[in-house]
Amino acid sequence: MNKKSIRDVDLKGKRVFCRVDFNVPMKEGKITDETRIRAALPTIQYLVEQGAKVILASHLGRPKGQVVEEMRLTPVAARLGELLGKDVKKADEAFGPAVQEMVAAMNEGDVLVLENVRFYAGEEKNDAELAKEFAALADIFVNDAFGAAHRAHASTAGIADYLPAVSGLLMEKELEVLGKALSNPERPFTAIIGGAKVKDKIGVIRHLLDKVDNLIIGGGLAYTFVKALGHEIGLSLCEDDKIELAKEFMQLAKEKGVNFYMPVDVVITEEFSETATTKIVGIDSIPSNWEGVDIGPKTREIYADVIKNSKLVVWNGPMGVFEMTPFAEGTKAVGQALADAEGTYSVIGGGDSAAAVEKFGMADKMSHISTGGGASLEFMEGKELPGVVCLNDK
């Protein structure tokens, strides 16, 4: 990685404004999944050990520029203190005289959590005045929020105009793993693209067709490709305005020598529920009033075989409606194939794929689970991420 990280700068006694991603799911004031807090711990611990004064900034939810009581970061700061085994202070604002006083009172190794940065309208507008206020608190800016790296906001990008800017350890790892996958992958390199909509994955499919040996398609977006082959798809999801594009992608794969895999059989249903009756049919036999909700058993076997024989697999998007038990088997099978594959480096591209491997208890069998859904998708589209571009080069 050609960006400076916290390993490249002197931190002792320095005030560090560290942007983390503490956007954790909450229910009635309780954190229901603390993965993101845990993901930031190595960076925070490193800063503490190096004798920095650690000022942590994050967003939580979408308060849209105003104070929303249940989106305060107070429970997060409390949990962070427990995980670090030390006293963590919490500010009621994210900048201003009261916060400056708290920062002035900090000793080396102290940790302070600022209030939700999205309580301020200027955050999402990347307002220069707000960025200056953030910068006034610190000597160095550290961006460790890969999950928000695709946003040009005041605390993820704007602040870098006024302070030296480096990556945290989590950001560094994300950029290394995803960067290597795209620039110098081990082969055979397989991408598995699922999810509901073709339109969300156009950029990533187009970019990956230049890089991969195998492209596997699943999820709701597969039915647009099935229809592009001339098959009836019943009530399955379809984007009619993307059928020509699907044809173009299949043609491109052929021209570039990419093995293009799509379902040969699917699980279909007449009702969308936990107790739904399902049938398994060939891809050319979906009845008119049924809809496809998962990949079938033959498809699972084919996909598992491709995975097993790959050196690198990048997975973005589930194979079916995995949140419902009757439609979860395809996604589970892909996860299992990745878990069982020996000598295969597996990169899970955040979002729903990450949620699926967590749900099925396979997370610890994956080589790398990205902490950024949207960010990893944009990175895999070959886009520059504002939260990365703003960091100082080595």
Swiss-Prot record:
Reactions accelerated catalytically: (2R)-3-phosphoglycerate + ATP = (2R)-3-phospho-glyceroyl phosphate + ADP
Keywords: ATP-binding, Cytoplasm, Glycolysis, Kinase, Nucleotide-binding, Phosphoprotein, Transferase
Protein's name in the database: Phosphoglycerate kinase
GO biological process per UniProt: gluconeogenesis; glycolytic process
Domain of life: Bacteria
Lineage, opening ranks: Bacteria, Bacillati, Bacillota, Bacilli, Bacillales
Gene encoding the protein: pgk
Compartment list: Cytoplasm
Record note on quaternary structure: Monomer.
